[in-house]
Structure formats: structure tokens, C-alpha cells
Amino acid sequence: MKNSIVKFSLTALAAFTLAACGSSGGSSDNTAAPSNEQKTQMTPSKTNQPTPNSTEANQNQTFTGSAFVISEQDDKVQVKNVKFNDANINQLEVDGKKITLTHPGIYSGSWQRIKDRINNTDVCCGSKYQNVRMGVSLSNGPTEDDILFYKGIPTQNMPVTGLASYKGDSIILSDDISDDSDEEAVEGQSSFDVNFGAKTLSGSITANNAPTINISANISGNSFEGTAKSTKLTDGAVEGKFYGNNAVELGGLAKANDNSWGAGFVGKKQ
């Protein structure tokens, strides 16, 4: 994985500029800035005060996840921010190209490498998560796209009160992960605390030899957006969603404002 990610981190993250895109499995905006999800306004019940077990039903934006899609033509890198609209966690479809995310009969609880004639896809983390997938799909040639993604089955019944903690997995990609010049990407952990009443999320992404990335976000519907900061890496932005019944899992992406690093993460409610 380390060697195959070099093309992604050295060419894509170093020149991370968002462009318009299309996907047979999703949609995109047409600006050069990161796309903003359409947010559903959440209105508390006027007749009853919510109890600790209350949920908000149907608070799902139409997209089910997103990806950074990196292509290179004539030494020029282009990056597209794709939104997925389907909830098939076994497959991605980008620009008509289908990418397998699971193998039948394989129930690994850790990172899984899936190869085909076009891509090498590293997916987290098999049977460990029931409602979301996150990973990196790397092309076998310079004319194909590289993809950093998360996708799942969005929560339909978001909690409106209470606290929850999530722990899970992450991947950080950067030219400056550590003193080891050959190490361009590392797999690690994620940890988040959520206040559903205040609609806030905070936490961190960590990985061996990589600086900790601290996450702070606001929740709208079943999605969240916010900032990603580190004492050793440049500041960035984060996006993500809650997945499964009663927000049992979450997933998302983050990247630096100066495009020097990118990250994906997933987590499970404890």
C-alpha cells in the first residue's frame, strides 16, 4: 500500500484543487471550492419535549458519501469532489467505472486489499462496520483515477439529545507524515465525542508517526462539517455523515487548506 499511494500523495495532495465533476453514482458542484451539502433544517417537536431516546426521523441529505477523485493528463492534476447518491456499501461507481469494496465470503475486521485489472483498493474495515466503508482506490496506470472515499447507509433517525463516543479507524496521506521519506500514508485510529443536543462533534485522527489531527464540527441533519487542525500540519476542513440505525457509525474525509495532506476516517458508537 505504501508504494502504491505515492502517486496519490505526491501529485494529487500537493496540487489539490477542486474541479467540477460528474458521476453515474453521484453528483457534484461546479465551483472550485469544496462543495457544501444541502442541509435540512431540523425543527424540534412543538408538542413534546424530546426524551434522551428521542430521534429526528428522515433527517437525511440526499448524498450517501463523497470522494476526492484525482486524475492526471499531460502532467496536469485535476481533482473532483464527487457526492454519492446510492447506499451500496459493496461498490463505488465513479464516471461509469465500478470499484468493488468487498469480496463475498471474506469478513476481515481490518484493512482489506482488493485488486482488479484497473485498481488496487484498500478498504476499511470489513465486518467491523456494518453501514459504512472508507478507503483509497489507486489506479494501476497514469491514465486512471485515484480515489479517497467514504460511503454508507445514512442514518434516518438521528438522536436529538444525549452524548455518544465513537472509536474507529483512519488513514492519513501526506508528503510530510514522518521522518521516513518513503512513508507517504499511514493507517491509524479515530476517536470522537458527539453532543446530539448541542449538535457538535469533536475528536481526533491519529496514526503511527503522523501528527494528530484534531476535528471540530457542527451537525446538521445526519451530516457534519467543520475544521481539522494540527500543531504540525496546516489547518484544514472536514466533512462527514452518520450511518446506520440511531447514528451507530460515522465516516468522513478531511484535507488541508493548502492541500498538503488528506485523510479518511470511520468510527463506531461505543
Where are the regions that the model predicts?
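Mature soluble binding/inhibitory domains
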Residues: 22-270
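C-terminal motif of bacterial Sec signal peptides marking the signal peptidase cleavage site
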Residues: 17-20
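Bacterial N-terminal signal peptides that target proteins for export
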Residues: 1-9
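Generic detector of short alpha-helix boundary/capping microenvironments
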Residues: 9-10, 228
